[in-house]
Amino acid sequence: ERGTITCLMGRNGSGKSSLMWAIQGATKSSGRVLVNHEGSWADPRKADAATARRMVSLVPQSASDLLYLPTVAEECAQADKESGVPAGTTRAILSRLRVELPEDRNPRDMSEGQRLALVLAIQLSSRPDVVLLDEPTRGLDYAMKTELTRIVKGIAAGATGDPAAVLLATHDVEFAATTTDRTIVMATGHIVADGSTRSVCTSSPGFSPQIAKVFHPADVMTIADVERLVNTPAAVSYTHLTLPTKA
């Protein structure tokens, strides 16, 4: 659903990436994939290339694999051409993402986070209905993960165009807790859990953020939750720590 961010979790080999590539249409698969495109349901795997690009865009685990031109400007211009949009569209998306990249910069000379932002802008140039992100936090530090949370929420909300449905696969439970609305857990190609990210992660020790384990049994998943807890009027004591009473 547009405006939502859903997380796919599961151990290696559970089928997360395979599902994403099947949705995108790059791999043969059985069953049906239906995307609500321009008011009707359609299978992106059966659409022509231009229509499929407007339905689903995928950012793979190694986002830099999609970058092959020598400058940011050329990458943006090529994306505009392939998406059939006015010149400058991809560059404008970068600006809306609040990411400033010199036009003459070679993508190979950029940080992992900068390359990811460029690939996101390229994939968003077609204004897709669904955006797929496969392990987007790989190689990112805490500050960039925080920035990525802002970017992903903006994509879902329509900050870069029309609101999109975002589906991301990750092992990063802290990122999932701060970024996603819903979490689906997969095992050997099957769904074994599906619900709000908070309920799924707190009910499964294997997918619970470290911060939730430290503050158990309090309902804590994120740093923001900790700040709210610390600022409550009464002191809260646990086996691991004591939070001070607010004066």
Predicted region positions:
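ABC ATPase nucleotide-binding domains
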Residues: 1, 207-241
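ABC ATPase NBD Q-loop/coupling interface
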Residues: 34-51
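Conserved ABC ATPase "signature" region
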Residues: 85-102
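Walker B catalytic motif
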Residues: 106, 135-136
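H-loop/switch region of ABC-family ATPase nucleotide-binding domains
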Residues: 170-171
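A short, surface-exposed alpha-helical micro-motif characterized by mixed small hydrophobic
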Residues: 176-178
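Conserved beta-strand-loop-alpha-helix hinge in the C-terminal portion
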Residues: 190-214
